[in-house]
Every structure is written in C-alpha cells, then in structure tokens.
Amino acid sequence: MAKQNIFDNEVFFEGYKDLRNREKNANNLFEIPALFSLLPELKGLRILDLGCGFGEHCKDYIRMGAEKVVGIDISEKMLEVAKAENSDPKITYINLAMEDLNVIDEEFDLVISSLALHYIEDFDGVLKNINNLLAKDGYFIFSQESPLSTCFSGGERWTRDENGNKLHLNLTNYGREKEASSEWFVEGVKRYHRMFSTIVNSLVDAGFSVERMVEPLPNEEILAKYPDYEDLFHKPDFLLVKAKKNK
C-alpha cells in the first residue's frame, strides 16, 4: 500500500505551518485540549507519538513527567523542525512511516497520534502493530478528522440561507468507505474515509477496548470570540478515541 508524505511538499509544508501558527486554529482550540483531557498520568511512562510533526507534544509529554518519548514522522521537514525546536535528552525522533511500525523493537505504555490516521490506508495493519508495541494494559489515544468530514466527496458541503448562513450539513456517501483526493494547499491530498462503526470495530478486532470517545464542541467563551465556530454544532471537526489494550 502506498505511503503518503505530502508534508515534505514545500508549498504544503509552508501552508500547514502558517495555519498552525494562527490564533484562530481549530487544532489548538478544540483538538489539542480534548486530546490532553484523555491522557492518563504520564509520570514514568514510555510514550510513542505517531505522526509527531513539529514535536511540540513530545516536549509537552516530557514536561508532564514521561520517562521517554519516541516521536515518528514520515516527513523529514517536520522532523528537522522538531529536532531544532523541541529536542530533549529523553526524546528520540525517527523518520518512519506509521505503516512500518513493525521495525520498532521497544515496548510502550502509551501510544498517541494527533490527526494522522485519516491519511493512512492500512488502518487495520497499523492498529495491530500499535497493539503489539503496547505493554499490558497500555493505552492508545488518537484524534482524526470526523467521519462526517472524511466522507465529503465534492459539491456543496452546506445548505445556506439567503444571507449565506449555514443551515445544515449536506451529508452524502457516508456509507461509502473510500480514498478521496482533495486540494488542501496543494492538489492530491489523500484521506481515507471510515465510518464510526468501522473505526470502533477495527479497534476491537486489533485487541482494544474503547473507553471513551470525544467530539469537541465550542464553549461560550470561544463562541463569543469566534462566532463562526457555531457550525461545529452541525458537524464537529474532530473525533478522539481512548482505547485500552486488552489482549
């Protein structure tokens, strides 16, 4: 199966970096707080960060007491930034695709992945490798784009009133699990759509029990500052899952 490395495209990389630096950033407002709310006590834990990107979270995990962190990413450009800006003696960065986790010969107490799995074709294979890397009773915590977003395959995403206000989401082809190419900074960015049931069943089949799922929504403080995020009550942007290894 093909491994996607869109982040080493110079145009994509610069566009993505600019997006993550903006104050009005859905990742910082919703996804990251939700992800951190699912974390257990990190003191003394061995952590694997899949798709670690710039490495900010790897550094956060060390500050929170982790014994060691291994961050992997397929993007050399991302890891250059991680090593320059978020290095630590307890952090190891490895240039590796998630599909190749089987080459890692270590054991971890916690595996974390932030917004990477919807770029992966072999979801089931990656989950099995994660389970193999986890210690007994270890946890896998991840975020991804909502399946209500990954099912989108063109046309008008929203029905709007005469003033352009969003009335409701136009949901189509939710049950058609597929690869979809879209334009995001550059053309040809591939995402893989899976239904909620597929995500849960794949986790169970890989030896996990699902303990919690979160679809973060804006609070009143965020809405007062960024009223456009009202549309998240129609369609949350993110899905987060906390799963425990049970076999």
Give a label for each model feature.
Residues 1-42, 56-60, 78-81, 140-177:
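Conserved class I S-adenosyl-L-methionine
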Residues 144, 148-153, 157, 183-197:
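Acceptor-substrate binding/catalytic loop of class I
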Residues 102-110:
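A short acidic, Gly/Pro-enriched loop at the edge of an enzyme's catalytic core
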Residues 110-123:
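A short SAM/SAH-binding and catalytic strip from SAM-dependent methyltransferases
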Residues 48-50, 54-101:
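Class I SAM-dependent methyltransferase SAM/SAH-binding core
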Residues 124-139:
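A short glycine-rich, Lys/Arg-flanked "PGG" loop and its adjoining helix->strand segment in the class I
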Residues 179, 190-214:
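Short alpha-helix
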